[in-house]
Design a protein with these regions (language model features):
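Beta-propeller domains
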Residues: 55-74
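Short loop/turn segments that connect beta-strands within beta-propeller blades
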Residues: 67-72, 110-114, 156-160, 199-202, ...
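Beta-rich, blade/repeat-based domains predominating
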Residues: 36-53, 80-96, 100, 105, ...
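A short helix->beta-strand "capping" segment at the edge of beta-propeller domains
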Residues: 24-38, 208
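Bacterial N-terminal signal peptides
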Residues: 8-19
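A short loop-to-beta-strand structural motif that recurs across blades of beta-propeller domains
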Residues: 63-65, 105-107, 152-154, 193-195, ...
Length: 302
């Protein structure tokens, strides 16, 4: 039996399969987006319901920035002393989640009050790196050990309890749930592999298999569009690669710098991709033909 969360999201995906109206515009061409003020740790972009971008690496390592539609950045909130943010995600209620790689935490932030709470702290975590979120609010966290070249995967249930789902992997980094909620993608940066796990009852991870391997360059953050195409940053190559659900490379986009660290979909229609690029210490953006999965979830939650 297919659970109701899969049916609901599947129905939404079907409603979005009709051709999306595309007016005369330039697609797949990156342009500088953000103002100055970021540093080489710029990472973890995520968009809220309005399409506004948030990311880390703005001045102090604790700061999370909000970037206005015209590219101006301002400090939104600072994490507690001793913390450093990386991946950011929003749930369907609008709450923000931040991976804290120095404090071994995942924080939850109320955007309205800017109150920060520790959702989970686990000393077994190396350094929570990036986050993915399922439609029911289950979080997944990649957890690399860069020194040893190994990594773990965590599932964080809706009660804030962390469950180690995989260990002994390579340097786990970018992570994303498929639109139908049945698969979890995770890449290993150093090993240049993307794995896919089956997601079972309660969000538990099942069998895994290699989805895609590359002969060179590394990986960082990843996101899906509404059709299930996976957009992955190629760290060292300076591109974002678009990969179909059948593991076919559909397109590769130059992002104007060699070290893209992560990406998200945003804007009013969900068809603007924002990329954090560490070499130039800025955000770049480009337009695409189909909206992102995050945008689809925002639409479904309205």
């Amino acid at each position: 039996m297919i659970s109701s969360r899969f049916v609901a999201l599947g129905s939404l995906a079907l409603s979005l399969l009709a051709p999306f109206p595309i007016h005369a515009e330039t697609l797949w061409e990156a342009r500088p987006f953000s103002s100055e003020g970021f540093n080489k740790l710029i990472e973890g972009p995520a968009c809220d319901r309005s399409g506004t971008v948030f990311c880390v690496g703005y001045g102090d390592a604790r700061n999370i920035a909000r970037v206005t539609p015209d590219g101006r950045a301002e400090r939104f909130v600072a994490l507690p002393e001793g913390s450093a943010g990386n991946g950011i995600r929003f749930d369907r209620a609008g709450r923000m989640y931040v991976a804290d790689y120095t404090g071994h935490n995942v924080h939850r932030i109320d955007p309205a009050t800017r109150q920060i709470t520790v959702l989970v702290h686990d000393a077994r975590m190396n350094q929570p790196n990036d986050l993915a979120i399922a439609a029911d609010g289950t979080l997944y966290a990649s957890d690399p050990n860069w020194k040893d070249g190994t990594g773990q995967l965590w599932r964080i249930d809706r009660k804030g309890v962390a469950h180690r789902e995989a260990e002994g992997m390579g340097t786990t980094n970018g992570i994303e749930v498929s639109p139908d909620g049945r698969r979890l993608y995770v890449n290993e940066s150093v090993q240049r592999r993307i794995w896919v796990f089956d997601i079972g009852r309660g969000g538990r991870l099942g069998k895994r298999r290699i989805f895609k391997e590359f002969p060179d360059h590394g990986f960082d953050g990843m996101r899906c569009d509404v059709d299930g195409n996976l957009y992955a940053t190629r760290h060292g190559k300076g591109t974002v690669v678009k990969i179909s659900p059948k593991a076919e490379i559909l397109r590769e986009i130059d992002v104007l710098g060699p070290h893209p660290t992560n990406l998200c979909f945003g804007g009013e229609d969900g068809r603007t991709v924002y990329v954090t690029e560490a070499h130039a210490q800025r955000l770049v953006s480009f337009r695409v033909d189909r909206p992102g999965l995050e945008w689809a979830r925002w639409k479904a939650a309205r």
